[in-house]
């Protein structure tokens, strides 16, 4: 079951996320978070226990919000052609991973010992797999997809290259042109999206007309 956050906790988490996105987890202090949130430093301990536990709750909160937004997003494209739906779902997932890239190192470590984080993420993966399966079946029925790979394999094909790109900047930056960190992230995201779209549609046997 998803954790319910109070309004005060949500306020603190939103402030923390804004700061961590700019300065990183290590570069953001509890004092900075409490100052910007206009609360006493002790309130961080009261609501979350520690900075590390607050980060775990922040990730849990972000996954919950992303899951809600994904459901809303897929509703807006439900009447589109299957190939367009698949393209937009892929782009959405990749964009979300890049947007919240500052979580990934933390999440890999924290998930080894935090069961509720695993559960939140598994629920989101299951929703993604169900949507991908639905789109694939519609594409087969419409005759635009030739093959029907397992939906979990398609999700793996989306997540794998994206996470590799995010975690291996020193390697990827050899192959993209950029002059700022922001430009690098844009170009890296564009590169991996193009690769994943090509790979998934090849797996589906889809050929653009």
Question: Where do the model's predicted regions map?
Answer:
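N-terminal intrinsically disordered/low-complexity leader segments
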Residues: 1-7, 74, 209
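Short secondary-structure transition hinges
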Residues: 53, 95-131, 153, 180-187
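Helix-turn-helix
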Residues: 11, 19-53, 57
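Hydrophobic alpha-helical connector segments
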Residues: 72-102, 151-158, 209
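Generic hydrophobic, amphipathic alpha-helix propensity
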Residues: 8-17, 33, 58-66, 132
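Conserved hydrophobic residue
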Residues: 25-26, 116, 145
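C-terminal peripheral helix-coil segments that are non-catalytic and often amphipathic
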Residues: 95, 99, 129-142, 157-209
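All-alpha amphipathic helical-bundle segments outside canonical DNA-binding/catalytic cores
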Residues: 84, 120-124, 141-157
């Amino acid at each position: 079951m998803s954790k319910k956050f109070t309004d005060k906790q949500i306020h603190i988490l939103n402030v923390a996320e804004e700061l961590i996105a700019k300065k990183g987890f290590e570069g953001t202090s509890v004092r900075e978070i409490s100052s910007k949130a206009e609360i006493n430093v002790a309130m961080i301990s009261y609501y979350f226990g520690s900075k590390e536990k607050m980060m775990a709750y922040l990730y849990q909160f972000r996954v919950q919000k992303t899951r809600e937004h994904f459901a809303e997003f897929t509703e807006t494209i439900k009447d589109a052609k299957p190939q367009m739906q698949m393209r937009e779902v892929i782009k959405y997932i990749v964009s979300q991973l890049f947007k919240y890239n500052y979580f990934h190192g933390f999440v890999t470590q924290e998930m080894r010992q935090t069961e509720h984080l695993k559960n939140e993420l598994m629920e989101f993966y299951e929703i993604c797999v169900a949507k991908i399966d639905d789109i694939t079946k519609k594409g087969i029925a419409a005759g635009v997809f030739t093959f029907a790979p397992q939906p979990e394999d398609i999700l793996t094909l989306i997540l794998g290259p994206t996470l590799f790109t995010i975690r291996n900047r020193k390697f990827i930056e050899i192959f993209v042109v950029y002059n700022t960190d922001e430009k690098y992230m844009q170009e890296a995201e564009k590169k991996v999206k193009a690769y994943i779209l090509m790979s998934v549609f090849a797996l589906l046997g889809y050929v653009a007309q």
